[in-house]
Swiss-Prot record:
This is DCD domain-containing protein NRP-B. SMART domains: DCD. PANTHER family: DCD DOMAIN-CONTAINING PROTEIN NRP-B, PTHR46034. The lineage of its organism: Eukaryota, Viridiplantae, Streptophyta, Embryophyta, Tracheophyta. Residues 185-317 form the DCD domain. It comes from the Eukaryota. It is found in: Cytoplasm.
Amino acid sequence: MENNNQSFWQFSDQLRLQASNLANLSLNDSIWSNNYISKRRDERINFDIKVGGEINSFKSKDPACDYNDNVNGSLLAMPYNNNNNNNIILGFGGVGLNGGFNKGIYSKPAFANLNNNINLNINPKGHKGKVEDELFHPSKSSKKNNNLNKKHGDNNNNDNNKDSKAAGDKRFKTLPPSESLPRDETIGGYIFVCNNDTMAENLKRQLFGLPPRYRDSVRAITPGLPLFLYNYSTHQLHGIFEAASFGGTNIDPSAWEDKKCPGESRFPAQVRVITRKTCEPLEEDSFRPILHHYDGPKFRLELNVPEALSLLDIFAEQDTFNDAFEALPA
């Protein structure tokens, strides 16, 4: 019994020692905080408002980082800052009567008050600023620079026009993408073009030729490549021929000589050929579906491997081939 009374009195004494500290607690503090009792009163949070007093008028010393211990050590341990008597807590505006909340509605963000401290250099009198004067009323030096830039711009345009003309001349000597095989495809054959006036010379000289713009294309021809001859006067395809040389330029300058320019051929993109098979010419309806067309009735002269093999198959179906055709590699 005496032990129980002694323990009771010890408990009551401890309770009296803590009474003064408990009296200083507010609703914004946790009584279960481990370090709350060890803090002095001026270090603890106190949102109590005295009549005629200021809200949060006290000034803290060094910022603390303890959980829920004072204004400086708030729930997120945000540092204390005083900006126009507005304490920034939890990233919001000044702390109100309810510790930063006003009937459950957050106050305006602190960054909304930045315009109180930052001068945007706006002239309320409506006078034009320096930047506006430079934009709408340039000085004489700026006008002079603009004229010089305009002059240089005209010179650049003239240079660009010259370059475009040179590029146009270069394109004239080469084939556009629509008339040539893609770069990742291997050339499998070639169709040369003639008419009734030039066909006899093609066969007699065993030389095929095309206009200058086909020079680069014809250079891709190698010996043994299947060749075909299209007569656009009769719209027939003749075959089968084989390249006997590499494609080149002016292999025989006297062939199809240009009367206006003696010693130069009208069809300088040339290759020597041999006849592999003499066949009946093919009509357009039999071979045109195989070819790649562009710009309506025009077809590509460069053949890929499937197109070349398909043309050889059509000629083979006529059963007019000889032993030379049998030796043609597939």
